[in-house]
From Swiss-Prot:
Belongs to the NAD kinase family. Signal peptide: none annotated. This is NAD kinase. It holds the Pfam family NAD_kinase. Its main location: cytoplasm. Involved in the regulation of the intracellular balance of NAD and NADP, and is a key enzyme in the biosynthesis of NADP. Catalyzes specifically the phosphorylation on 2'-hydroxyl of the adenosine moiety of NAD to yield NADP. It is found in: Cytoplasm.
Length: 300
């Protein structure tokens, strides 16, 4: 079958160490290949499920070769591959094989119907922002990372509160004693930041949110900043303070280390089925639909 879609090569990425994921991945690969698309697998995914019929590529090779990546897993899988493919602007399609699934919005039961429709051009596209962070020690950068959801400075479970000196665009904001501080994107506002009483930011809002974790002073409240802000967090006191990036990579900090966070120049293109609604996602995932909506007749 000749492909007339804007997509020619489709990469499949699966959630690691997940029993039962081989069958849906191989079924999806066959479904896509039968429609004339070239199918490649992310290398670790291919090795884990024993796929040998398709090329196995590292993320950088996927970025250079694939036109779109279909991710079967949970939000964590999307976060990980999203960071790696962001420099290549490879669009992502998410199939939920996890628990919550805020950004993997296609049910696995519907993937063989919906994914081919999207590959044929029937989708809605949006751009999700990333954060970039670097750790400065004695005036020198020692670590750099991207974050799809959030950059989190926090204490270990066996140490006391950390004192953090926070400034925005070079202007002093406050000294905060707390268990830590979350700097989140709109995408990340429904992750750790939400559980720490932060606000929900619509994904298309141009902002980042700072959310204290269990602050000593109850007046230390979350604040939303313009997304062109540069946030600097210096470690004033505290033992065993770490910084995490999407809770998937971390590094230990020393006193006087400074974490500089700003919006990355990279964005992640995300593709959704036609009719996708962010508000429908919130209703479903946060159980807002426990009460009848205006679109539904109340039950008698």
């Amino acid at each position: 079958m000749q492909v007339t879609s804007q997509f020619k090569t489709v990469a499949l990425v699966g959630r690691n160490n997940t029993p039962g994921i081989a069958e849906p991945l191989t079924a999806l690969a066959l479904c896509i290949a039968k429609r004339g698309f070239e199918v490649v697998f992310e290398a670790d995914t291919a090795a884990e499920i024993g796929v040998t019929d398709y090329p196995a590529l590292r993320p950088a090779e996927i970025g250079a070769r694939a036109d779109v990546a279909v991710v079967l897993g949970g939000d964590g899988t999307m976060l990980g591959i999203g960071r790696q493919l962001a420099p290549y602007r490879t669009p992502l399609i998410g199939i939920n094989h996890g628990r919550l699934g805020f950004i993997t919005d296609i049910p696995i039961s519907d993937m063989r119907e919906i994914v081919p429709q999207m590959l044929a051009g029937n989708f809605e596209r949006e751009e999700r922002v990333l954060l970039e962070a670097r750790i400065m020690r004695d005036g020198n950068p020692i670590y750099h990372a991207l974050a799809f959801n959030d950059v989190v400075v926090n204490r270990s479970g066996f140490s006391g509160m950390a004192e953090l000196h926070v400034s925005v665009d070079g202007r002093f904001m406050y000294n905060q004693r707390s268990d830590g501080l979350i700097v989140a994107t709109p995408t990340g506002s429904t992750a750790y930041a939400l559980s720490s009483q932060g606000p929900i930011l619509h994904p298309q809002l141009q902002g980042i949110v700072l959310v204290p974790i269990a602050p000593h002073a109850l007046s230390n409240r979350p604040i939303v900043l313009p997304d062109d802000s540069k946030v600097s967090i210096q470690i004033v006191s505290g033992r065993e303070v770490n910084v995490n990036f999407d809770m998937q990579s971390f590094t230990s900090l020393e006193l006087s280390d400074t974490i500089e966070v700003r919006r990355s120049r990279h964005t992640v293109p995300m593709l959704h089925p036609v009719g996708y609604s962010y508000f429908a996602t919130l209703r479903k995932k946060l159980h807002w639909n426990e009460y009848p909506s205006h679109e539904e007749d109340p039950k008698p």
